[in-house]
């Protein structure tokens, strides 16, 4: 369980941060369950709401990641992805969610966005129009070495 619900329903935040943590550090012990437990023990899990946004910046720093929030702007997102910096995006209502959902922006392929969606293998296997995704994005956090 996470944030008062089944992890599969409310755990997109810890899962997204786990994906980034393992990619950035190679430490496979920082799996979704580990990040969810960390979030719960440190006040980042909110019953009935999922994950506090602060997990993506403050929580990430506590587990050893360098991160910053950047504006939801195409050029900033593209530049960071081209530099190899993964980005966690908080999605608003649209194609990914009816309320709120965290996904990972992993790169660009032929000018289109590649993502890891903790809730959908199908979404993760295709590429996306970057403007289409950013129109649904509420906030983004970039991770770097």
Where do the language-model regions lie?
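Short, polar loop/linker segments at the starts of domains and inter-domain junctions
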Residues: 1-6, 103, 128-129
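Active-site-adjacent structural segments surrounding the nucleophilic cysteine of cysteine proteases
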Residues: 1-44
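Extracytoplasmic/secreted envelope proteins and their assembly/folding machinery
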Residues: 13-21, 32, 36, 53, ...
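Mid-length scaffold segments of soluble, non-membrane domains
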Residues: 30-31, 36-72
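Extracytoplasmic/secreted cell-surface and envelope-processing proteins
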Residues: 47-49, 54, 96-101, 123-125
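Active-site-adjacent substructure of cysteine-protease-like catalytic cores
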Residues: 61, 66-114
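Noncatalytic regulatory segments and standalone regulatory/sensor domains
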Residues: 108-145
